[in-house]
Amino acid sequence: MKKWMTVCALCFVFFLLVSCQQKDAVPDTAKKLKAPLTGLKTEQKVTERRPVAVVVNNHPKARPQSGLSKADIVIEALAEGQITRFLAIFQSQMPETVGPVRSAREYFVTLSNGFDSIFVHHGWSPGAKKQLESGAADYMNGLDFDGSLFWRADFSKPPHNSYTSYDYIKKAAEQKGYKLKQETNPLLFQTSDAKPANESYNVRVDYGTNNVTNLVEYNYDKKAEFYTRSSDGVITTDRETGKPVAMQNIFIVEASHHIIDQDGRRDIDLESGGKGLLFQHGNVIETDWKQVNGRIVPVKDGKWLPFVPGKTWINIVPDLDAASISKGEGV
């Protein structure tokens, strides 16, 4: 009897040890999972989610926009005139509402393809139409889904009132046979905490002319350790939350711009690389940039520079002189 009880006790102890080891193994695995475009801890199902890239209107009448706070990466570039548009790339978080959605340009398609995203837009330029209809990308065009998977907000007028959602994007993808799961190649991120600058720096980016004002400002909050953005003196907020949009990396890159038609549409050289300014932790680093497989990445002395884990905003400008740096107030 005693022998039998001893055997049972040993088996029970063995079972407990094995159970504890299995429980410990799950968190260890989970700790290694990072969102590919933010470098932040996440879940397995998130790492398998295909990115979505949405062309978002940045006309003054379109502000504040919806969904920008959930984008992992936002790329800002000129469309026609001195008005910019955003390419908002979502992967770790998906928007319940995103917009106003605007029309495609060829360079936005190229940038979207760098992440193998589903490309979401409402309308297109002749060049982008030819590009997309030739199979350059999986896309969802608001012209095909206006009134169904895109809706018109009643607080604004066209073309500043077209919106969609991730649920509707998924429905369109299923209708068109696009994959919704994939492994996304990660960006390069810092693996250790970098020291913030003793003196933090802010930056202004002037997309305007003598007749048109389009001034973007990024200000660093030392206490919160992120940047906020403003357009023409008004803080950039997310319409859905009312809160300022925050980011950890600001990357300003110079690329050649050329007017290509009588409507003022542009071609932007995303192949040649050039000069850049990288803002992180209040610091500013003079860099170069390269386009690698459709992605704009910072390079210094021939080596890629890592991003700070978090969200990244990239501003493409015709001339780096559009950026002016100033000391922060140490908030």
UniProtKB/Swiss-Prot annotation:
Cross-referenced Gene3D superfamilies: YerB-like
Provenance organism: Bacillus subtilis (strain 168)
Membrane-related topology note: Lipid-anchor
Coiled-coil ranges (or none): none
Main location group: membrane
List of residues that carry Phosphoserine: S103
Recorded phenotype for the gene knockout or disruption: No PcrA-related phenotype.
Compartment(s) where it occurs, according to its Swiss-Prot or TrEMBL record: Cell membrane
Lipidation (S-diacylglycerol cysteine): C20
Record note on quaternary structure: Interacts with PcrA. The interaction is not essential for cell viability or repair of UV-induced lesions.
Phosphothreonine: residues carrying this PTM: T97
Name the record gives this protein: Putative lipoprotein YerB
Superkingdom per UniProt: Bacteria
UniProt keyword Phosphoprotein, yes or no: yes
